[in-house]
Amino acid sequence: MAKNEKICIIGAGPAGLSAAVHLEKNGYTDYSILEKEDHVGGKCHSPYHDGKRFEMGAIMGCPTYYAVHELELFGGVDHNGPKLERAYRKMNGKPYDPFNPKKNPLLIPHLLKMKSQVKKLGTLLATKYKGYQYTGHKGISEGKYDGYDPVTGKHVVGENPNLKDLCMNFKDFCKLNKVELAQEIWIGPYTAFGYGFFDEIPAAYVLKYLDFATAMYFVNKDLWTWKDGTQSIYEAVNEKLQHPARLNVNITKVTRENGKVQVYIGDKMEEYDKIIVTAPLQYLPSYFDATEQEKALFAKIDYERYDVTAITCKKGTYYPDMSGYLFDNMVPERLGHLMVFYHRWKDEPNQVLTTYVLRNYKGKELKTYEEAKKMAWDDMKLCGIDIDKCVYERKWYYFPHVFEKDYADGWYEKVESMQGQLNTYYAGEIMSFGDMEETVQYSKDLVARFF
């Protein structure tokens, strides 16, 4: 592709900014990043309260975040944030330690069995499911792997018929492999972080995000945070780009005619040679001249209704010294209840705590935002936390994905076969996963493959 091509990138979240960085590294200089919000970073969103930043979206990373680290180096930032500690609570708010055999001697047989199954899963992933961890989903439903290896920095292609098992939901996948207890480890950084319930989400999503090494870093609390929030990574990257993102851009229409791409911003038209879409593909047909294939495929996308509130505690009342995980609430039967509250700044009771809830599950009625918010705050009260006020809240369009049948029917292979048609390229969360490492990796690989 000619290096002087004019390229439009829709979205200035991790995916869009990663695409821009790697276009620059590949010698492209004529690109524009168009962002509808008034800030960059997407769901890496770190507002200020009382002089410090807190997290409303992405919170942490770990040493397997290779692509994010590359962006850190580009922007000149480091993971220099507060160390994260966590405790566990029952649904009644009372503290307990489900993983400590000294405090729970009756649980020793269960814990030993769980440890054995986790080890078994690690072995299976490295052998039976070789190739499971590479970026993107192309080939999985056909028993192949075709993605980016962040460890070597190379695109890897191969065959492994066992990978078809990743099309089934994670609960069934664990049952098939007789490692059901491993779910007790994976659920904390998965369901609590808003990515859905194990009996409805294809195993490929779970394991591409929480590959074995990443899962173990979460277990051992070998985690990265950022003093100025995850948003600061992308602010720094944006400042270093030759063409920083244009903010508050309202794209009204996109057409693809005469071998070019026409992007309408209000009543003005800008013409490009290529377009990379990192904004939600589910909504692409509402403003693109979408093909019938685009309409049909993108209509199959669903997403999680994941809500976050940032609250302060009443002065002089109990302020926890670490985050709290409520495993009992991470099941469909407790939909809408508090799954985790996040504590960021030690010994600073004037700082916020953030609450996290899921409102949707297949076959169950969607909880309303206000209904789930009340449930979460009532759960906070059970934890001994007396809420003063809400300083920030957000309803996220979160973790776009497809379900088992569409995954197995080759949804990803069909979308990947469309890459480059009508000078259009698809990236963002749906093409990989909803965490920042996978989205950043996918954009890097997309640029390497096509630009």
Predicted regions and their residues:
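N-terminal Rossmann-like FAD-binding beta1-loop-alpha1 element of flavoenzymes
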Residues: E5-S32
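Conserved Rossmann-like nucleotide-cofactor binding loop
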Residues: A15, H39, Q282
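Glycine-rich FAD pyrophosphate-binding loop
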Residues: E24-Y48
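Mid-domain catalytic core of redox enzymes
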Residues: N26, N250-L366
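Conserved FAD-binding subdomain of flavin-dependent enzymes
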Residues: K43, G51-P82
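Mobile amphipathic helical/loop "lid" adjacent to a hydrophobic cofactor/ligand pocket
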Residues: D78-E200
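Helical element adjacent to the flavin cofactor pocket in flavoenzyme catalytic cores
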Residues: L210-I265
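Conserved flavin/dinucleotide-binding core of flavoenzymes
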Residues: Y342-F451
